[in-house]
C-alpha cells in the first residue's frame, strides 16, 4: 500500500477508501473562492461494482493500491464461478461471479483476459477485458423496409448472450467489433 495525496489521483488507479477497494473513474480539483479547496471523486467499488461520489479535502492522504494485471485464458463456467488458466504455469484458477461482474457479457471461452490482482495481498480483485472484442450475432430481428428516416437500430443477441443495439443492416451470423467499456457496436468485421 503506497501512501499518497489527492495530487496523486489519476483516472484508473485503485485506492483503498472506507475499507474497500475503489477504482477512480473521475476526479476534479475544486477551489471555490475563499473557501478551502477540495477534490470531488467518482469511485467504482471493485467488490460490488457500485459507483459512489465523494469529496475530500485537497492534500488529504489516500492509500494507493498497487495492482498487477496477469493475462489468463477464460476456459469455462462451473456453477457460480468462472475458471481461468494462467498462460505461463497452466494453473487453473476459479474466480467467483461477483468478481467477474459485467465482464461476463463479453467473455468468450478460450479468449485471453487480464485478471487484476492486489499486488500486496496477491488476491484477485477483478477481471479486465480487452477494449474491443469480436463477437458473432446469433439472433436479431429483420429490419423494417422504409423505416430509415433516422439511424434505425435493433436489438441483437451475441454468442455470449449479451443483447446490444445494432444498425438495421446487421444480420444473424455477422461478426461485430464491440467496445467492452460501453457495450456499444463499433463496426462489422
UniProtKB/Swiss-Prot annotation:
GO terms for biological process: peptide biosynthetic process. SUPFAM superfamilies: Nucleic acid-binding proteins, Translation proteins SH3-like domain. One of its GO terms (molecular function) is translation elongation factor activity. GO terms for cellular component: cytoplasm. The keyword Nucleotidyltransferase does not apply. Pathway: Protein biosynthesis; polypeptide chain elongation. Pfam families: EFP, EFP_N, Elong-fact-P_C. The keyword Cytoplasm applies. Involved in peptide bond synthesis. Stimulates efficient translation and peptide-bond synthesis on native or reconstituted 70S ribosomes in vitro. Probably functions indirectly by altering the affinity of the ribosome for aminoacyl-tRNA, thus increasing their reactivity as acceptors for peptidyl transferase. HAMAP family: EF_P. This is Elongation factor P. The lineage of its organism: Bacteria, Bacillati, Chloroflexota, Chloroflexia, Chloroflexales. The gene is efp.
Amino acid at each position: 500500500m503506497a501512501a499518497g495525496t489527492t495530487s496523486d489521483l489519476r483516472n484508473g488507479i485503485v485506492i483503498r477508501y472506507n475499507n474497500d477497494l475503489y477504482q477512480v473513474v473521475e476526479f476534479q480539483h475544486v477551489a471555490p473562492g475563499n473557501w478551502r479547496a477540495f477534490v470531488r471523486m467518482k469511485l467504482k467499488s471493485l467488490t460490488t461494482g457500485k459507483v459512489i461520489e465523494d469529496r475530500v479535502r485537497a492534500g488529504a492522504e489516500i492509500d494507493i493500491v498497487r495492482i498487477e494485471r496477469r493475462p489468463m485464458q477464460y476456459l469455462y463456467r462451473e456453477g457460480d464461478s468462472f475458471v481461468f488458466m494462467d498462460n505461463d504455469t497452466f494453473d487453473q484458477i476459479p474466480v467467483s461471479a461477483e468478481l467477474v461482474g459485467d465482464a461476463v457479457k463479453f467473455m468468450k471461452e478460450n479468449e485471453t483476459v487480464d485478471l487484476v490482482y492486489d499486488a500486496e495481498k496477491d488476491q484477485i480483485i477483478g477481471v479486465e477485458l480487452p477494449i474491443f472484442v469480436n463477437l458473432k450475432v446469433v439472433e436479431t430481428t429483420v429490419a423494417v423496409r422504409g423505416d430509415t428516416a433516422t439511424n434505425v437500430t435493433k436489438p441483437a443477441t451475441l454468442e455470449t448472450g449479451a443483447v446490444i443495439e445494432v444498425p438495421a443492416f446487421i444480420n444473424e451470423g455477422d461478426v461485430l467489433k464491440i467496445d467492452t467499456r460501453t457495450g456499444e457496436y463499433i463496426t462489422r468485421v
